[in-house]
C-alpha cells in the first residue's frame, strides 16, 4: 500500500511500520469484508467491521503523530487512510455487491464478487488518493511531502 510519506516508510528492519508493513494492515480492510458479507450478516456485525477499520485508521494516524510530534503528518495519515482504506473502497465494494445482487438470485455470488474485488481495487485506489492529496491537501493545506517526495 502506498503511504502518505512513502519516502520515509521504506521497510528496512529498523523502520518497519506496524500499520503499513505487517499483517496489521489487513485491519484497514475489515469494512470491505463487511461490505461483501452485508447481505448475509446482521447489521451490528456489518457496522462492527467499520468500527474495526476506523480504529485502525485512528491508530495509524496517532502513530504517525506520536513518532515525531508533527500534527500535519498525523492529519495526513488520518485523511489518507480514511479515504484509501475505508471510504473509497467501502463504496466500491458496496456497489460491486449491489450490482452482483441484482444480476443473480444466488445469495453467495454477491459476497464472492465483493471479496474478489478487494485485491483488484487496492492499488488503484491507493494511487488515486495519493494523486488527489498530492494535488490538493499536501502542498497547500498540510504542507507535508507528497507521496513522490
Whereabouts are the PLM-identified features?
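Glycine-rich, hydrophobic membrane-spanning regions of integral membrane proteins that mediate transport
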Residues: 1-114, 128-149
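Hydrophobic alpha-helical membrane-associated segments
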Residues: 113, 117-124
Amino acid at each position: 500500500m502506498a503511504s502518505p510519506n512513502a519516502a520515509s516508510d521504506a521497510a528496512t528492519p529498523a523502520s518497519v511500520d506496524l500499520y503499513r508493513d505487517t499483517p496489521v494492515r489487513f485491519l484497514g480492510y475489515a469494512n470491505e469484508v463487511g461490505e461483501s458479507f452485508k447481505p448475509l450478516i446482521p447489521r451490528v456485525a456489518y457496522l462492527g467491521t467499520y468500527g474495526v477499520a476506523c480504529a485502525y485508521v485512528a491508530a495509524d494516524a496517532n502513530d504517525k503523530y506520536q513518532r515525531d510530534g508533527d500534527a500535519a503528518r498525523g492529519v495526513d495519515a488520518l485523511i489518507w487512510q480514511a479515504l484509501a482504506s475505508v471510504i473509497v473502497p467501502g463504496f466500491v465494494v458496496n456497489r460491486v455487491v449491489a450490482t452482483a445482487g441484482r444480476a443473480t438470485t444466488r445469495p453467495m455470488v454477491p459476497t464472492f464478487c465483493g471479496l474478489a474485488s478487494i485485491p483488484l481495487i487496492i492499488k488503484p485506489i491507493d494511487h488515486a488518493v495519493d494523486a488527489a492529496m498530492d494535488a490538493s491537501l499536501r502542498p497547500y493545506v498540510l504542507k507535508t511531502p507528497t507521496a513522490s517526495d
